[in-house]
């Protein structure tokens, strides 16, 4: 695929115009979707199996893992769906996870533990879980010489200057 490629460039948002030789962490992300049985929370909670309980149990297990994984590892998550009303036990809940580490092999190893935690959470809460891998990447391999040369050329031409209108538009987007 890259037989005829001499260099590959990428861009990442930052607060300055520069070319830098910074790497990234290896990363894998997925959306974990828990399904349960909905019921009225006061009228018949015994008939329900809360998908949100599955998400919360999973998150709790992931948080407990943090003490027992390499320090340079990172686990991030956000609940993206957790129910519609407090008086209804949710039959669907979703949580979006990132797992990062400097080495891709370690991400794979830790990811297996995360998947096992999701399965355990589902078993313990009487729910079902499935997940969809959203993305994964290895850490960037940087070229210090090329980055230094590119930064020198960027500074020679002055980088990007935004108009007043572009800055106002960015501020407007930032406010939403």
Predicted regions, residues:
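Histidine/acidic-residue-rich, glycine-tolerant segments that coordinate divalent metal ions
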Residues: 1-90
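Metal-dependent amide/peptide-bond hydrolase catalytic core
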Residues: 52-176
């Amino acid at each position: 695929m890259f037989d005829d490629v001499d260099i590959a460039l990428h861009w990442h948002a930052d607060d300055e115009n520069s070319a830098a030789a910074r790497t990234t962490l290896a990363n894998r992300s997925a959306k974990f979707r828990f399904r349960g049985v909905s019921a009225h929370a006061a009228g018949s909670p015994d008939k329900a199996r809360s998908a949100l309980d599955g998400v919360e149990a999973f998150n709790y297990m992931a948080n407990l893992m943090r003490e027992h994984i390499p320090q340079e590892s990172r686990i991030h998550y956000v609940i993206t769906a957790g129910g519609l009303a407090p008086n209804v036990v949710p039959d669907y809940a979703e949580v979006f996870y990132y797992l990062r580490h400097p080495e891709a092999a370690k991400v794979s190893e830790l990811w297996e533990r995360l998947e096992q935690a999701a399965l355990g959470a589902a078993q313990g809460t009487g729910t079902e879980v499935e997940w969809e891998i959203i993305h994964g990447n290895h850490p960037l391999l940087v070229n210090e010489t090329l980055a230094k040369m590119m930064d020198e050329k960027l500074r020679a031409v002055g980088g990007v200057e935004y108009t007043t209108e572009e800055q106002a538009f960015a501020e407007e987007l930032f406010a939403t």
